[in-house]
Amino acid sequence: MRSWAGDATTRLRAVSAPQFRTDLHLADRVLDLSRPVLMGIVNANPDSFSDPGHRSLEVQLDQVRSMVAEGAGIVDVGGQSAITDVAEIDPAEETDRVLPLVEAIRAELPDVVISVDTYKPVVARAVLAAGAHIVNDVSGLRAPELAPLVAEYRAALVVMHTAAPPKVRLQASDLYDDVVADVRDFLSAKVTEAIAAGVGKRSILIDPGPDFTKTPAQTVEVLRRLRDLNPSGLPVLLALSRKDFIGALTQTRPTDRLAGTLAAVAAVGSGSGVVLRVHDVGEVRNFLTVLEALTATDPVDADLRLTDDLRWAT
């Protein structure tokens, strides 16, 4: 692996994270995105690389409680893994996995914004009827019924770039003539489609789809040029956490990619108009807290102190 320092002609660029529109309109509220909002990942499936194995509803709900306490403003509930070598499940089974958790969150934590990671209209209708606020569609609106359904419930929609159907692994260095232009044009067309179906423009987030039908180099190029692929300045969902492009750069497994995740957050995910989809809510929150303190111009509270119980043991 190349030395992190590079060669003598290489210099670190000044980090200036992109800034995008700072309001996201949901059916019952407007979400303030003037600072990055953390979306905690909650897997209601046994196939996820981060949370393998069956977990009871109470265990899942306890994870939601912990993420909210750590600073998550949104929880993203998923019932089907995006892993390509795991078979797709039918909509009824996916609904059975996610609906009880959505209902439990709404009942116990009504202030929490609920996103559901699905591209299936049957699942989306069930969770929207139960009170979910956002449909996180990783298919790029392949189901024509999905956008009108989101509009019917006045919910928000995540439009993600991908060049293949769900569960299809496609990575090739020559797949795109210009990956940034292709992602920009795809997202622009899909946003237009969603608006035509009745979804409010202020209820749409775009997702450049890191790793989805992109090589690590293509993902890095897309993230470097995030401003270029979002000329309208729509809010952006960034799913950077533990991604394969980070693993390729650092040659690490998913569970060892926190440092790389934080570096990606600093570079492209620390500005306004951003939702960060993350596994490690507390760590990302702490990182952003320190980053903001060190880069802001506002004075730090003069009375700020560390409590004795948090000091190094003597």
Language model feature labels by segment:
Residues R2-A8, A17-Q19, L26, L33, ...:
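Active-site-adjacent loop and "lid" segments of alpha/beta metabolic enzymes
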Residues D62-G78, G271:
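Catalytic domains of carbohydrate-active enzymes, especially glycoside hydrolases
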